[in-house]
């Protein structure tokens, strides 16, 4: 007979602050586990609203708990605590490795550092391919693992001037601005660009070149025009 895990910790990311934690929370509850939710710092309010809704729906507060805290020693204590029987993590591979280092024997259900791609072959409808690639890559300002951040061009598509022109036109016509403006296609990133993201927006690797070079559009570093590099 299956024995439920007594306590599951759910550590969702900020980019889908309701849908992703809701999946982990309800799955754990359905299997008989109590749940502690430790939201990403950028999405603490969203997590609070979600849990309020679940409490109002009848989930006991001592079965579903919000652990609203900043990163640090308390987070480590939560993840490493022996009472925790399972941890659900959609996030980066570095975060998964960090959590595993804190407690190597902890069962970890993780989806980490996804990299989505669109493959365009010579038989493809190039108009449709350009539209799909641009919408997938730059929707949500590219801040999701399902964003097609990599386009793989096969055969003649790789040298097609028509495809490149259409791609450049489509990218350059995207409207960048406030998410409160319904005309906006690309909004701000969640935090000012830094580290690997800043390097990706400003520097090229060996053999790479800009098809469309991204530009910083605000003083803070959260609003950028979309960019495309080739020769990756």
Question: Predicted segments — roles?
Answer:
Residues 53-60, 80, 93-231:
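ALDH superfamily catalytic-core signature
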Residues 1-130:
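Rossmann-like NAD(P) dinucleotide-binding subdomain of oxidoreductase/dehydrogenase enzymes
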């Amino acid at each position: 007979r299956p024995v439920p895990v007594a306590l599951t910790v759910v550590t969702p990311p900020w980019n889908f602050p309701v849908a992703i934690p809701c999946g982990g929370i309800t799955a754990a509850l359905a299997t008989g586990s109590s749940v502690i939710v430790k939201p990403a710092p950028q999405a603490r309010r969203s997590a609070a609203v979600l849990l309020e809704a679940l409490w109002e729906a009848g989930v006991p507060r001592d079965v579903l708990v919000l652990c609203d805290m900043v990163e640090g020693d308390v987070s480590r204590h939560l993840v490493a605590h022996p009472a925790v029987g399972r941890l659900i993590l959609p996030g980066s591979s570095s975060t998964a490795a960090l959590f595993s280092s804190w407690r190597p024997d902890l069962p970890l259900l993780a989806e980490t550092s996804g990299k989505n791609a669109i493959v365009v072959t010579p038989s493809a409808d190039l108009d449709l391919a350009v539209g799909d690639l641009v919408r997938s890559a730059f929707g949500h300002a590219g801040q999701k693992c399902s964003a097609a951040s990599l386009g793989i061009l096969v055969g003649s598509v790789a040298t097609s001037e028509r495809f490149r022109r259409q791609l450049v036109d489509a990218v350059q016509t995207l409207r960048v601005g406030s998410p409160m403006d319904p005309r906006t296609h690309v909004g701000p990133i969640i935090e000012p660009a830094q580290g690997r993201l800043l390097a990706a927006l400003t520097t090229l690797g060996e053999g790479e070149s800009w098809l469309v070079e991204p530009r910083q559009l605000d003083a803070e570093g959260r609003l950028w025009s979309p960019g495309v590099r080739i020769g990756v």
